[in-house]
């Protein structure tokens, strides 16, 4: 709690001196490291063996888990936790609140764990490409989009950011089927563009009900 309070005081002063922002980020990241395991494979095991309400509720998929366990020593050695300090205060807090995988509402991943999870999930058994991707992301050359960060390694590996849909039919059934599809996409962090040009115009006749469309 003292670390959190200190970081909040520091960030409140950064408009007076920009170095307070650096101090705040170092405090919150150091605090997170104190409260989490450094071993990527141990974190993976916790996520895989998670139990909710006395029922197995694995947060990662079995294929991903077995790949990690098979190569855990080389993967653990590749993680560089110091690179977490490349994130600024606001960037880290965004990861902490929304992106790092949680157990019982508490983030247990470190930022480097998240980046390695993404790299290994994308490149599967090709460790060389996975490590190259991890190196690029951890050194801030690029980062993947939100759905990839959310879903990599999970039981719902949906990586796409954007979906373009059209109303499946100009009817109550067609409209609500399309809205259901939109809800499922949104559930896993996909963005949606929806075309409704095939819906009848306002004041058009509705034969099924002998009514008039509201448009």
Protein language model annotation of sequence segments:
Residues 1-215:
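Extended catalytic cores of very large enzyme megasubunits
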């Amino acid at each position: 709690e003292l670390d959190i309070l200190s970081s909040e005081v520091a960030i409140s002063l950064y408009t007076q001196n920009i170095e307070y922002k650096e101090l705040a980020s170092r405090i919150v990241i150091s605090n997170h490291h104190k409260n989490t395991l450094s071993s990527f494979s141990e974190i993976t095991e916790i996520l895989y063996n998670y139990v909710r309400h006395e029922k197995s509720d694995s947060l990662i998929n079995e294929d991903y888990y077995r790949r990690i366990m098979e190569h855990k020593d080389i993967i653990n050695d590749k993680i560089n936790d110091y690179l977490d300090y490349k994130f600024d205060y606001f960037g880290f807090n965004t990861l902490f609140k929304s992106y790092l995988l949680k157990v019982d509402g508490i983030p247990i991943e470190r930022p480097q764990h998240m980046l390695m999870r993404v790299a290994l999930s994308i490149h599967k058994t090709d460790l060389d490409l996975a490590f190259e991707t991890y190196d690029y992301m951890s050194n801030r050359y690029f980062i993947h989009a939100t759905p990839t960060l959310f879903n990599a390694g999970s039981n719902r590996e949906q990586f796409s950011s954007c979906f373009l849909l059209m109303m499946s039919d100009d009817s109550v059934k067609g409209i609500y089927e399309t809205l259901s599809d939109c809800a499922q996409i949104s559930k896993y962090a996909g963005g949606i563009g929806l075309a409704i040009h095939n819906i009848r115009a306002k004041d058009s006749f509705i034969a099924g009900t002998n009514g008039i469309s509201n448009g």
